[in-house]
Structures are given as structure tokens and as C-alpha cells.
């Protein structure tokens, strides 16, 4: 009897040890999972989610926009005139509402393809139409889904009132046979905490002319350790939350711009690389940039520079002189 009880006790102890080891193994695995475009801890199902890239209107009448706070990466570039548009790339978080959605340009398609995203837009330029209809990308065009998977907000007028959602994007993808799961190649991120600058720096980016004002400002909050953005003196907020949009990396890159038609549409050289300014932790680093497989990445002395884990905003400008740096107030 005693022998039998001893055997049972040993088996029970063995079972407990094995159970504890299995429980410990799950968190260890989970700790290694990072969102590919933010470098932040996440879940397995998130790492398998295909990115979505949405062309978002940045006309003054379109502000504040919806969904920008959930984008992992936002790329800002000129469309026609001195008005910019955003390419908002979502992967770790998906928007319940995103917009106003605007029309495609060829360079936005190229940038979207760098992440193998589903490309979401409402309308297109002749060049982008030819590009997309030739199979350059999986896309969802608001012209095909206006009134169904895109809706018109009643607080604004066209073309500043077209919106969609991730649920509707998924429905369109299923209708068109696009994959919704994939492994996304990660960006390069810092693996250790970098020291913030003793003196933090802010930056202004002037997309305007003598007749048109389009001034973007990024200000660093030392206490919160992120940047906020403003357009023409008004803080950039997310319409859905009312809160300022925050980011950890600001990357300003110079690329050649050329007017290509009588409507003022542009071609932007995303192949040649050039000069850049990288803002992180209040610091500013003079860099170069390269386009690698459709992605704009910072390079210094021939080596890629890592991003700070978090969200990244990239501003493409015709001339780096559009950026002016100033000391922060140490908030």
C-alpha cells in the first residue's frame, strides 16, 4: 500500500513539473512575437495579417481624418498643387473607420507594394489606372463599391467624404479572391533603449508656396516619448477618438518630383535614393535613404539605421530645404 502511494505521489509531482514547464513555454514564445511594422509585442494572429494601404485625403476640408492613429506607417507626399495625401499602412491595428479615401497615384501603388498590401483608393489617375488594371497590385477601388463597401459621410461633401472600414475591406478582398493572411517582412528596429537627447528637436516641413500654405510640424514630447503632428498650426487628431495622432519616428526624405500632365500630376523618383533626416527620441540624424523592395529605409555609412519600436511617419519632399529644425521646449 505504502509503495503504491509513493508511486502515485511521484507521478503527481512529475505531472506538476511537466505542467509548469508547458505553462512557462507559452509566455516565452509569446514574448518573441513582434508586429513586423512597429516592432512592438503582439499576438500570433496579428503577425499573420496582411497589411492594408489606404490613400487618405489631406485637403484642409478633409481634416480631421479617421483611422490615422491606428496606422503603423504613414507616408505623406504631394498630389496636385501643394496639397499632400497620405498612404496609411495598417498591419498591427486595423481601422474601424478610415478616410476620407482619395484617388490613386502611381507612386502610392509602388509604396504600397513594398509591403504587399491590399491597396485601397477611391478613383485613380490615368497612370495608376493602367498600373492597377495590369495587375500591379491587389486593389479595392471606391468607384466599384460606392454606396456599398464605401459610404459617404453627411458632414462633408465630395470628394472629401468617402469612407470605408477594415470589415468592408475584408469583404471586398473575399469577393475578389485576395489573400488576407501572409507573413510580412519586418522592418529593422532598435533592440535596446536609445538615450533621448539632452536637447530635443522639432521639425517643420513646408509643402507650400507663396500663395498656398501647407505647413507640417512635428513636436517631441519628452515625457511621453513620442511626436505629435500639426497641419497649419492645428494638431493632427483622429476623428474617431478626438486624440492627437502620435508617432515615434519621423523620416523626411528628398526625392525628385516632375509634373507629368496639364492637371499637375507628378512623378516622384523612388528609385534613386537621396538625402534624409531621421528624428527619434528627440534626436535628429542626417542620413541617406534607399528604396529597398519598394520600402524607403534610412541608411548611414552604407548601413541601415533601425527605427525606434512604434509608429513611423515618412514625409517625401522635393527638396530637403523644405525641412527646418528647431530646439524643443523640453515638455
UniProtKB/Swiss-Prot annotation:
Which N-terminal residues, if any, form the signal peptide? 1-19
Entry GO terms, CC: plasma membrane
Does Nucleus appear among the keywords? no
Compartment list: Cell membrane
Covalent lipidation (N-palmitoyl cysteine), chain numbering: 20
- InterPro entries on file: DUF3048_C, DUF3048_N, YerB-like_sf
Null phenotype?
A: No PcrA-related phenotype.
Q: Which residues are modified to Phosphoserine?
A: 103
> Which domain of life does the protein's organism represent?
Bacteria
Q: Which PROSITE patterns does its entry note?
A: PROKAR_LIPOPROTEIN
Membrane: present as a keyword of the record?
yes
User: What UniProt keywords are attached to this protein's entry?
Assistant: Cell membrane, Lipoprotein, Membrane, Palmitate, Phosphoprotein, Signal
| Record membrane topology | Lipid-anchor
Q: Indicate where the modification Phosphothreonine is found in the sequence.
A: 97
Covalent lipid adducts (S-diacylglycerol cysteine), residues:
20
Self-association state and partner proteins as the record states: Interacts with PcrA. The interaction is not essential for cell viability or repair of UV-induced lesions.
Q: What is this protein called?
A: Putative lipoprotein YerB
